[in-house]
């Protein structure tokens, strides 16, 4: 009988801790979205620690903030950090699209010369490679499992 009570107590404690972790993640996400909608584009490092069950979200949100501010290099770095956490589908493709866009936005077609053409092509190939990874887009056909990633890859090919 004592063992059954202990098991029930342990299950109860684990359930409360799991609920608390999910609640903290939810509150941090809602707070970030609320501030973003109010055009308060800043991030709290507290969210990085409190969002421990989905650590990629902090970097993804921070990348969105940088992108909104026109800091495409900062956005690129944050999306790259988010991808290191290997989020599942569909987040993976969404992050790859944003990562690729942050690279493309750093390229000004008016400033491309013979001297920097190879570097520009390398950057576009980097963006394209990100879209092709994990099948978000396909190189030889239109069968990538994310239509936005496929469209962006096709635009880069042009």
Language model features with spans:
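Hydrophobic membrane-insertion alpha-helices, especially the h-region
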Residues: 5-24
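Alpha-helical protein-protein interaction scaffolds
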Residues: 28-155
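N-terminal Lys/Arg-rich, disordered targeting/topogenic segments
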Residues: 1-2
């Amino acid at each position: 009988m004592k063992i059954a009570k202990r098991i029930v107590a342990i299950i109860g404690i684990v359930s409360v801790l799991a609920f608390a972790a999910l609640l903290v993640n939810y509150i941090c996400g809602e707070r970030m979205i609320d501030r973003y909608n109010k055009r308060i584009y800043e991030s709290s490092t507290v969210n990085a620690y409190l969002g421990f069950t989905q650590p990629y979200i902090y970097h993804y949100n921070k990348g969105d903030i940088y992108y909104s501010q026109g800091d495409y290099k900062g956005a690129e770095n944050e999306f790259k950090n988010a991808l290191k956490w290997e989020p599942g589908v569909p987040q993976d493709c969404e992050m790859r699209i944003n990562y690729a866009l942050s690279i493309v936005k750093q390229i000004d077609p008016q400033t491309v010369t013979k001297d920097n053409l190879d570097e520009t092509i390398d950057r576009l190939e980097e963006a394209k490679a990100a879209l092709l990874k994990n099948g978000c887009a396909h190189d030889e056909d239109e069968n990538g499992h994310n239509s936005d990633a496929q469209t962006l890859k096709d635009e880069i090919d042009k």
